[in-house]
């Protein structure tokens, strides 16, 4: 009997040590992103690295170029690297079936950023996400409203024929923006029968400057009468290529360019006429996905096998150097929308309070907190 009690005691102590060791382990979160070095990706990395430092979290990055095979492989890579959680910017929602399966099998929490699974377009993946204990949720923008707003800005600037450059056919974010562009055109034309807008079918410029430029030039060559070009996104390099192509044709300022994903020199681009307007400031989106996964790992946010968290992040719009100035002062360079103390405080919030903080983020919000 004494031997049995001694064995039970030893096992209890061993289990206690194992639990303690696990509790003391540093949290590790993987980030699967199209690129951590382009305009938007590097800004995302800057804020996530700051959050990781403030919360004492290890981060591992994988750049997957929005190539489907690399997106799904990135989840496997990060799971094998002993990540406790993953945040991912996938390309097509179909990829999430494999990603969620990998995370379920490895008991790794996962959240999407800049993306959400549409229940109508991808019902199987949506059902899989709802049923997964390890799929935490998604942080994303209202791409539909973003698209409508940009088209409205072009209409107000007098544009009549708009070219459209996407980056990857079937990309969920592009599809949402495209629906918004089309709805914006329809709404504008219904209210301005004497000044209708025509939106061309999309051409795809991938995510490099070379392909972005070649695609923009091809659109212009096929439609020399366009007076506007929407470069839907793609991380920034696609837009830089398109701007270079327009400049090479001597059409800077003659073709109004709008896009999503703020460039680091947007003020100069607005001043020169290379850009007419841009939506952006959303590089903090993955920061909130990071906090979702962080809290799921710590057990603060319960995950469900019949639903997930869905957080909407606000876009900011600028159409002049003046409107960009405040953003540049408080969001770029060495500045971040949240400092270390604020990051720690956000990490302690309930989900509802965190979602409210996310929805409230704006230039005015940051100025109020950080203005000296």
Q: How does the language model describe each region?
A:
Residues 22-372:
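A residue-level marker of the well-folded mature domains of exported/periplasmic proteins
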Residues 1, 17-23:
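Intrinsically disordered, low-complexity Ser/Thr/Pro-rich tracts
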Residues 1-8:
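Positively charged n-region of N-terminal signal peptides that target proteins for export
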């Amino acid at each position: 009997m004494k031997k049995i009690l001694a064995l039970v005691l030893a096992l209890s102590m061993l289990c206690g040590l194992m639990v303690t060791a696990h509790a003391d382990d540093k949290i590790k979160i993987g980030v699967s992103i199209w690129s951590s070095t382009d305009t938007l990706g590097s800004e995302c990395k800057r804020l996530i690295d700051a959050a990781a430092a403030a919360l004492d979290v290890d981060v591992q990055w994988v750049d997957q170029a929005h190539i489907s095979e690399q997106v799904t492989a990135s989840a496997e890579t990060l799971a094998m690297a002993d990540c406790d959680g993953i945040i991912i910017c996938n390309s097509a929602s179909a990829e999430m079936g494999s990603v969620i399966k990998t995370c379920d099998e490895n008991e790794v929490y996962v959240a999407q950023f800049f993306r959400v699974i549409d229940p109508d377009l991808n019902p199987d993946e949506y059902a899989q996400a709802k049923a997964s204990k390890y799929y935490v949720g998604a942080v994303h923008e209202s791409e539909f409203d973003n698209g409508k707003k940009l088209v409205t800005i072009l209409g107000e600037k007098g544009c009549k024929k708009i070219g459209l450059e996407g980056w990857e056919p079937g990309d969920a974010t592009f599809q949402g923006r495209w629906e918004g562009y089309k709805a914006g055109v329809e709404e504008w034309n219904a209210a301005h029968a004497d000044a209708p807008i025509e939106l061309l079918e999309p051409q795809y410029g991938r995510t490099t400057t070379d392909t972005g430029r070649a695609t923009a030039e091809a659109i212009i060559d096929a439609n020399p009468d366009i007076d506007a070009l929407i470069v839907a996104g793609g991380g920034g390099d696609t837009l830089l290529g398109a701007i270079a192509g327009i400049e090479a044709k001597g059409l800077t300022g003659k073709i109004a360019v709008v896009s999503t994903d703020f460039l680091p020199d947007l003020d100069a681009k607005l001043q020169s006429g290379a850009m007419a307007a841009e939506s952006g400031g959303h590089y903090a989106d993955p920061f909130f996905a990071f906090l979702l996964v962080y809290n799921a790992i710590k057990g603060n946010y319960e995950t469900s096998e019949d639903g997930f968290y869905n957080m909407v992040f606000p876009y900011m719009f600028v159409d002049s150097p003046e409107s960009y100035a405040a953003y540049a002062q408080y969001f770029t360079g060495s500045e971040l929308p949240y400092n270390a103390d604020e990051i720690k405080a956000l990490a302690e919030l309930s989900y509802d309070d965190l979602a409210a903080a996310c929805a409230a983020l704006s230039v005015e919000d940051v100025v109020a907190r950080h203005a000296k």
